[in-house]
Amino acid sequence: MNAATVNSNVYKVLPQSNRTLTIKLTTLRIGNIQYNNRVTVNASGRQFAAGGNYKITVKITGNGITVGGATWAKGNVYRSGDNFYFESSQSGYHSGTQGGSFFGWNTLSSSNNTYGGSSFSSNNDPCYQVAPRGTWCTPTANQLQNLGNSGYRSGSMNGKSGGFFGGNKVFLPAMGNRGKNNVNYWPGTGYYRSSTGASNKRCYYLEFNQSYAVKNNYYWYWDAFPIRCVKR
């Protein structure tokens, strides 16, 4: 989009007592990102009078925050039943070690002591499953490193402790991690999963506290962390 507001061509619609209009943006570019066939709006149960003029306004609000060269979701991913969703706010998370907010490496399961093989797969990526499927992914170690280098300070949002990144644009709640024994360790520290594996069944993650934010690889595949997804 080259402007904040764009007007479409005028289309003729035959009047009916009750009809549904579908608006689909087949080609859409915002900034340097393509969103082709991603936006569809249905206006159902509408009545149109003969000779009338009507205007339908579609407002597009971004569901991501661009920091450090990546677009980050506005909330952590969580599992509920067999489905995956984003929290309604950046500070939100599901409490409890198996409440749906902690994931081992390379697995869709939020249960304790679960992980996938040594090659990270989209089929095992909780972010990849969020509708529309294939839009998001777990960040790489470099993407988390870039987020940490974008400017960090500890703080709180909505009463939840955590860290701000990129000039207060991205907030990650500090939730600690879930050990193999189903214990929530270091709840005042932030640990966020990457898709990048390390040696000996370890993996990279972003760790932050009141003093620093660094990329680390101390923990194992089966140690569960929260995930903040990025756009693919």
Where do the model's predicted regions map?
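Short helix-loop boundary/capping segments
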Residues: 1-3, 172
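Short, compositionally biased
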Residues: 3, 8-133, 196-198, 221-232
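C-terminal, surface-exposed recognition/capping segments
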Residues: 76-80, 91-95, 107, 112-113, ...
